[in-house]
């Protein structure tokens, strides 16, 4: 007798295998109303083309996973992605003078929305990572209700977060 096999069940069981291996950078940290996690993984192909550094010219895809906390005063539910933030990074390798800097782009992957960019590092070693998070700004951004009935609190001014990690390389793309 044949055992019935469920294709949806098989796909559900294989889904975790489709994720790239992420390397956490320290513990998530807090900005006012936000939790910010830092991770890296192998460089990522993106659409539209040209949005980020090419994978062939990059060592890692650096991400800031930014979610609302329970005490978020800007109207976001706990755990939800917060869009339209201005997120930048700087990386400094211990014992090296150059500082790598860049701006993150909002993007979405199979594990959800985040801010990120492909980055060329200065080789293996210990790195100091700084995220600078600024609130939405300008007309092309996220409007905020300010009336007494439906308004939300003003945005935070600026938030800087500091992480340290050791980069020893990553596995070959597709080898995860």
Model-predicted segments: where are they?
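Short, compositionally biased P/S/T/A/G/V-rich stretches that sit at domain boundaries
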Residues: 21-56
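Short coil-to-beta strand junction motifs in C2/discoidin
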Residues: 56-58, 76-87
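Short amphipathic, basic-aromatic surface patches that mediate peripheral association
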Residues: 62-79
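Surface-exposed loop/edge segments in extracytoplasmic proteins
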Residues: 95-103
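Short acidic/polar inter-strand loop motif in beta-rich domains
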Residues: 134-146
């Amino acid at each position: 007798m044949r055992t019935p096999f469920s294709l949806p069940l098989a796909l559900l069981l294989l889904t975790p295998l489709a994720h790239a291996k992420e390397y956490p950078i320290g513990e998530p940290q807090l900005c006012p109303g936000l939790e910010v996690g830092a991770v890296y993984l192998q460089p990522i192909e993106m659409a539209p083309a040209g949005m980020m550094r090419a994978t062939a010219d990059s060592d890692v895809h650096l991400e800031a996973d930014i979610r609302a906390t329970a005490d978020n005063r800007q109207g976001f539910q706990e755990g939800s992605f917060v869009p339209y933030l201005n997120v930048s990074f700087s990386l400094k390798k211990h014992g090296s003078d150059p500082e790598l800097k860049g701006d993150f782009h909002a993007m979405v992957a199979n594990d959800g929305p985040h801010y990120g960019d492909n980055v060329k590092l200065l080789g293996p070693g210990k790195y100091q990572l700084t995220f600078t998070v600024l609130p939405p700004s300008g007309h092309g951004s996220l409007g905020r209700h300010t009336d007494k009935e439906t308004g939300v609190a003003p945005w935070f001014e600026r938030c800087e977060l500091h992480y340290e990690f050791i980069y020893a390389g990553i596995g070959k793309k597709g080898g995860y």
